Regions:
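Histidine-anchored nucleotide/phosphate-binding helix
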Residues: 10-25, 168-174, 283-288, 589-605
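Conserved catalytic-core segment of nucleotide-activated headgroup transferases in glycan assembly
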Residues: 235-329, 592-594, 601
Length: 606
């Protein structure tokens, strides 16, 4: 069987690494493709797999089509995704709704929240209208050609349901060619916090009964198309042993081997909601302020999230003893060993909202989260998937509402190396391996894909009359948008030319005003007693004096220099404050360069 596996980027495929390897070992021909590049090691991972198995190849997918139709598709899909988050079940998830609203077309947001929207049936009517319009979108010719060339028996697409996902074009192209399709759900939040499925793939592979219920209730999928397999991405942590001793691990990381340590796992939070470095520093201060002897001098290992390294630039944690900031994206053997060892030897795991909680549960560690109001409303209780960590089989997390409440809970839960936490074990049996802790998910996932490949090929989906009508309605919109896009360079050049012309006219006007002031007000100015006696200035000599040639700088007669002098002179004669900056280097050094300007401002200001 030939399997084409298309991911948004190659790092997504790390969630299916064990399944890809198992399918390859069973002799299936596998093509791994991605829509775009990434820098988290995913490409190297799939190339290592392809190097081991000659029946595995790697290539780039065509990605989204560009131009006017791509923009029309994006707007329609973002509008539909926004309408999804207006459903009552999302009333307590304000940031999910806000995120969708920020990306949606303004007209859709306005109609959905205005009385005029009721004329088309409110949210449901708008959804039906936009869905009908979406069916009129042309199918990507590049993707169809790619599928024709590959001739797969089944196409796997992940994640497929990103907000405004262009991968829906892949799905539509496969259906148009009569190719079997599978959505392998990659993560625990995809079905509840992403976009709505527009049509039903032949199979949707989920982890557990909770995700199956989401697929049925949130996406309206037929029950016979949803297959529960367990979470294959976590199989690699079951039964694993550390790669080194605890002493060697602590020496490698830089922690005191004589004290236990807590692992803080950073999260992929909603942008603009939480500054996690500041939160971590506050948490560290709370631990260090504790008088509990169990926490005295305890080690802290802060593990960054690979997608949010930028926010840690410039953060200095060196002032805290027995604390290290360490860890890489686990996409190769060494990084996986490091990650597992950090969990295995930790005494507890702490974080906000991350899949690392689930991995720590597999290892058997006590897991903690602090539900601070300013954090929880967007990133914890303000999401649907976080609630599984609180509820499944009694819940995984030990939660507190403040650092004062959290610190003694953490001290009480400290565990030795290895696993054994009962809350973690119960959660794993309900969420990760619903068929039993000893029943791996990867073989079930492989069986689901093989079964999908034996299904009768779906009929080729042609365009309905409604789709053609929608296309005819969208065509003039796309044509106008195409004209807008093609004229964009010309409009940009024209705008730039007009701005430059305006600036030249403004400069000329300012020169005339200055000359008028010198000619008509100079005599009156000479009668005023000067408050400050100053020497000559390279930039602005006193009225009536000639510039000293010896003080003339090279380039003074350049047009830009003359223009700058005029602007600075006018600025100096205004009554407004002058703000100097920004300081791009050490402030003292910067100030040395600005001293002549400050001296000039003092002498010639007003």
């Amino acid at each position: 069987m030939k399997i084409l596996f298309i991911a948004r980027h190659y790092s997504y495929l790390r969630l299916f690494e064990s399944a890809v390897v198992a399918l390859a070992e069973r002799g299936h021909q596998i093509v791994l493709a991605a829509d775009r590049a990434e820098t988290m090691g995913g490409r190297q991972m799939v190339e290592r797999i392809a190097g081991r198995y000659p029946n595995v190849t790697v290539c780039d997918a065509p990605g989204r089509y560009t131009g006017a139709w791509a923009e029309v598709a994006r707007k329609l899909r973002l509008g539909l995704d926004y309408l999804r988050f207006l459903e009552p079940r999302y009333l307590e998830t304000p940031h999910l709704r806000q995120r969708a609203e920020e990306r949606a077309p303004r007209v859709v947001v306005w109609l959905a929240n205005s009385p005029l929207g009721t004329l088309v049936g409110g949210r449901r009517g708008l959804t039906a209208l936009l869905s009908a319009a979406e069916r009129g979108l042309p199918i990507s010719a590049a993707m169809k050609q790619f599928l024709v060339e590959q001739q797969p028996d089944v196409v796997l697409i992940t994640p497929l349901i990103d907000i405004g996902s262009p991968q829906l074009d892949h799905f539509a192209a496969a259906r148009a060619l009569g190719i079997r399709t599978v959505l392998p759900v990659g993560s625990w939040d995809h079905l509840s916090s992403k976009a709505l499925l527009r049509a039903a793939p032949d199979r949707v592979v989920v982890w557990n009964p909770m995700q199956r219920q989401e697929a049925l209730e949130l996406h309206g999928l037929p029950a016979d198309r949803v297959v529960v397999t367990g979470a294959q991405c976590y199989d690699q942590w079951f039964g694993r042993q550390p790669s080194r001793s605890r002493e060697d691990f602590c020496a490698r990381v830089g922690l005191d081997p004589g004290r236990p340590f807590v692992l803080y796992t950073c999260s992929s939070l909603f942008r603009g909601t939480v500054n996690e470095p500041e939160l971590v520093e506050a948490w560290v201060r709370a631990l260090r302020a504790s008088t509990d002897p169990r926490l005295k001098g305890i080690g802290i290992l802060v593990r960054p999230h690979p997608a949010r390294l930028d926010e840690w630039r410039g953060v200095d944690l060196s002032g805290h003893k027995n604390l290290v900031f360490w860890g890489a994206h686990p996409v190769d053997a060494e990084a996986k060993d490091d990650y597992f060892d950090s969990m295995y030897y930790s005494a507890a795991v702490v974080g906000i909202n991350t899949s690392a909680f689930i991995e720590a549960a597999v290892v058997g560690k006590p897991v903690h989260a602090v539900l601070l109001p300013e954090v929880s409303r967007d990133n914890q209780e303000g999401t649907l998937h976080f609630r599984y960590l609180l509820n499944v089989n009694g819940g995984l997390l030990r939660v507190a509402r403040s650092f004062d409440e959290h610190v003694p809970m953490l001290a009480d839960s400290l565990a030795p190396a290895g696993g054994g936490d009962e809350k973690a074990a119960r959660f794993v049996e309900g969420f990760v391996r619903p068929f039993g802790r000893g029943e791996a998910a990867t073989p079930r996932f492989v069986a689901a894909i093989e079964e999908a490949g034996t299904l009768p090929a779906p009929a080729r989906e042609g365009r309905s009359i409604g789709a053609w009508l929608a296309y005819l309605v969208l065509f003039p919109v796309a044509s106008l948008l195409a004209l807008h896009l093609r004229s964009q360079p010309w409009r940009k050049r024209t705008r730039h030319r007009l701005v430059k012309q305006f600036e030249r006219q403004r400069t000329l006007a300012l020169r005339r005003i200055k000359q008028f002031a010198i000619d008509h007000l100079g005599a009156a100015g000479k009668q005023r007693k000067s408050a400050t006696t100053v020497g000559g200035s390279v930039l602005t000599p006193k009225t009536g004096r000639q510039r000293d040639p010896a003080k003339t700088l090279a380039g003074t007669d350049l047009r830009e220099a003359r223009h700058t002098r005029e602007l600075v002179t006018v600025m100096g004669r205004s009554n407004r404050p002058i703000i100097v900056g920004p300081w791009l280097s050490e402030t003292g050094f910067e100030l040395l360069y600005w001293i002549p300007f400050v001296a000039w401002a003092k002498a010639y200001g007003n």
